[in-house]
Amino acid sequence: MKVLVLESIPQEYKEKLESVAGTDITYTNKNEVTQEQLQQSEVIIGNPTMEQLDTCDALQWLQLSSAGANTYAAHPKQFTLTNASGAYGVAISEYMLTCTLNALKHFPEYLHLQSEKVWENLGHVATISDCTV
């Protein structure tokens, strides 16, 4: 089975993929992938462009590296489509917590003032303690 990986993945994941018998794996990215690689791949891991997907004659399975799959689901080619839904839950949660704390503590404003070498108190800062966030 010809597998095309269009994402940078950790070595441990490469080793797991390569342990599957009968796989011929190519690692590249969607900016450097060749027409021949796209045409011959039965499995693609990553998010090819729609134009690239149009040329994937042998494609049986597309594993997206993103959660959003609407554009790919609407593609007329028939293939199994899976996404990375749930893979980013912790990262998104941490990002939202960071955004909330940045807003409550005036971090962007203080960072700007600090870069200007201005030491000004911006007043009351809120806390997330006892809050519904």
Where are these regions (language model features)?
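A structural micro-motif
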Residues: 1, 23, 59-60, 79, ...
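Short secondary-structure boundary/capping segments
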Residues: 17, 35, 71-73, 124-126
